[in-house]
Amino acid sequence: MIVRTQNSESKIKEFFEFCKENEVEFVDFRFSDIKGTWNHIAYSFGALTHGMLKEGIPFDASCFKGWQGIEHSDMILTPDLVRYFIDPFSADVSVVVFCDVYDVYKNQPYEKCPRSIAKKALQHLKDSGLGDVAYFGAENEFFIFDSIKIKDASNSQYYEVDSEEGEWNRDRSFENGVNFGHRPGKQGGYMPVPPTDTMMDIRTEIVKVLNQVGLETFVVHHEVAQAQGEVGVKFGDLVEAADNVQKLKYVVKMVAHLNGKTATFMPKPLYGDNGSGMHTHVSVWKNNENLFSGETYKGLSEFALHFLGGVLRHARGLAAFTNASTNSYKRLIPGYEAPSILTYSANNRSASVRIPYGISKNSARFEFRFPDSSSNPYLAFAAILMAGMDGVKNKIDPGEAMDINLFKLTLDEIREKGIKQMPHTLRRSLEEMLADKQYLKESQVFSEEFIQAYQSLKFNAEVFPWESKPHPFEFITTYSC
């Protein structure tokens, strides 16, 4: 369905000219592993050859969990010369190039390469005739802390994060002897001005750097939790949007680091306060027309509602990709503006799917509110598209919208209404995914080999260790038994 990325002679020439014009000293080839970690290998510009840009760069794939065994470790990084930018943090002039992974044994794009999977999902949409392009836009929330301490030993398990904004510092004597006292408090941080908002200058610096690397931002503000922020960037096609998430996370972490802070996109680092999500806006277009625009509920089309029906039907297994950590499910609980009930509504932030207000047909879209940034964006976006396409093909009814505050529903009321909820654990979401995976495998977008590698990695690296480790809270509840 998809062939190896081959950079044209004109693209290669254009890239070399770009490097010379910008006096580039290093070329930094970057790729994403299964978990979503951004990895890189750099070459001096003087060592760069035409063949490397045409045929790729060899690397050892056995060093990345879930990929190759050491007996078949050779893979190729294929540079994508439509996506590159000057690294604003490098001491020397370095250009970052997005790469796909190519399988030298099967002579095809590597089926465990997340970026290749995202490309296959977009191509599957085109080949199906349902649409030409799927647009995604992510709103990534994050925390910026002053420091963090972590210990993971057989006799001791703990973490400690700190922030000047933290309510726990109300009685603290700082080094200069002054405690200014302006703090947002738990769930009190939505859009206050300084001095309560201590991170304004860091966020504006983040925006400036994002603009430097080609990301157009449209909103920046303090979020609800203490030490929490959000920067929204413009939408793009599925692959571009996932690339943008990787760029955004890199910039946020680096700007915080250079300001003596530490940034995290972890979904739930603070108990008793709001967590961080990755609200994901989606629309599908064909012949330059928004297929989600129509005459049904809130200006949506039948196509859009069927797309939504597919996502809601598959959401419990979809969560294995959109909410990909054990920590994700500590965010998806009532009371912290994180949706756990699988329904939809217009302008209702308690629903797992929101239909935002739009002033034109072009703005018709869904906002999926359950994903978070512990996910690999290439996999999360691809899985959402595959679920939606399944809904369109099979005309899946999403049910009635629920224009009420869903956070106020009791468990009995949820059961009486027959409403599904998100899984409560990563284990459960993985089990749901394994029981409901056929839609992912259409056109081999997600291969069986990849699905098995993914679930094995998640169980062994996250689920099993989490289930086997004593937790500090258990010592409070159980030590004196």
From Swiss-Prot:
Annotated localization: Cytoplasm
Q: Where does ATP bind?
A: H281, V282, S283, R349, R354
Residues recorded as binding L-glutamate, renumbered to this chain, are N274, G275, R331, E337, R349, R369
What does UniProt list under activity regulation?
The activity of this enzyme could be controlled by adenylation under conditions of abundant glutamine.
Binding of Mg(2+) 1: at which residues?
E139, H279, E367
Q: Name one GO biological process term.
A: glutamine biosynthetic process
Q: Quote the cofactor binding remark.
A: Binds 2 Mg(2+) ions per subunit.
The catalysed reaction is:
L-glutamate + NH4(+) + ATP = L-glutamine + ADP + phosphate + H(+)
The protein's matches in SMART domains, at most eight in alphabetical order, are given as: Gln-synt_C
The EC number(s) given in the record are 6.3.1.2
* Residue ranges occupied by any GS beta-grasp domain in the UniProt entry: 22-106
Q: Does the keyword Iron apply?
A: no
Q: Which residues form the GS catalytic domain?
A: 114-481
Disulfide pattern: none
The function of this protein is:
Catalyzes the ATP-dependent biosynthesis of glutamine from glutamate and ammonia.
Outline the subunit composition.
Oligomer of 12 subunits arranged in the form of two hexameric ring.
What's the protein name? Glutamine synthetase
Its lineage opens with:
Bacteria, Pseudomonadati, Campylobacterota, Epsilonproteobacteria, Campylobacterales
Gene from which the chain derives: glnA
